[in-house]
């Protein structure tokens, strides 16, 4: 049973394979037919295109032959035309030479005529300028007069306003004065009447009181009457004083009234004078205005003539400017070339200066360092000298030794035994011969050497001091507290050192200080502290 089933399956599979082979063969045949038809169509298309290309090549060959023939004809025509043009150019060159000669002749004639015209017109211009200046002066005088007239008119308006204000002020003051007078008179009469009434009342009251007291106390009558009399005298004196003050006020008001009346009269007189001046000035203004109109017409006529002459001269100047513009262009071209050369020189100079500044900075740093060392050494030496002096003074006070010489440490000018004198000894070139090592020199001498080298490098003459001569006074002094008091500006010295500024170096050897003081003539003084 199982073997039969397997045979059936194998038969079915073989039938399927044969069907697949048949289908593949049919598909290959169809593809071949399609390819053949496609290649046939392509062949036909290529044949047609070949025929077309053959026809076009024939037509192009014919047209090429025609163009060659035309080219030959054109070349012949061009040769003939060129020969004709050359002849014409030769004739034109001859004509140009003749015209150049004529042009030079005409230029010479025109230059002569131009010189004559320039002389003529310069004379006319000078005459016109003289006339113009005269007229301008006259017009300036008229303008100044007009300005004065206008200022007078403005001043007149101001004066009129001031007069009106003064009139109003006078009226107001008169009114106020009269009101105050009325008020004061009424107050004065009222006060007078009131005081009289009060006095009468007091007298009546005092009389009644005196009568009653006389009746009651007849023993004390004299004493009370005396007191009342004293009181009444004081009251009367007070009222009389008030009356005198009121009279003084009334007198002052009367005096002020008189002054105001006097001022009013003066103002009236001034107003009359100003009115007379205004009338005169109006007549002067009218005459001046007529003169101005006449001068303006004359000035307009002169300006027209002057403008016409100026236009002519401007035309001549334009022609000359056009001729000079060509020369200006040439000069500008030369200037540009010179500027380029100058820029190159500047670049070279800048490079040289940049290289030079590096050396200058090195020397400046060295000088600065030497100065710092000098300051430190001087400060240290002062401290040591002061300590030694103090020890000797203490020993002398104790009676062990004699008192030393007085010594100053504040750098005074007239001191005979100062520490600065010892410090200045370090600047002297004593006991020094040739071939000296720089390490054996003092800091002050090192600074001098550096400055001398820097001056020689810059090409500046250096100052020379003899050994016997006194060096310059230092620009600073080290105080007891250790602070440096500078009398000179170090920045100025550094600015003067640069070669780019072309300023000679100043020998500031007085500013340098030594850490170690050489043995000199003052050694005996320092040893006897």
Curated annotation (Swiss-Prot):
Disulfide pattern: none
Pfam families referenced in this protein's UniProt entry, alphabetically: DUF4515 (PF14988)
Compartment(s) of residence: Cytoplasm, Cytoskeleton, Cilium basal body; Cytoplasm, Cytoskeleton, Flagellum axoneme
TM helices/strands, residue ranges: none
Entry's Gene Ontology BP terms: flagellated sperm motility; motile cilium assembly; sperm axoneme assembly
Assembly mode: Interacts with MNS1 and ODF2.
Entry's family note: Belongs to the BBOF1 family.
Function: Plays an essential role in sperm motility and male fertility by stabilizing the sperm flagellar axonemal structure. May be required for the stability of ODF2 and MANS1 proteins. Dispensable for the assembly and function of motile cilia.
Name of the protein in question: Basal body-orientation factor 1
Gene: BBOF1
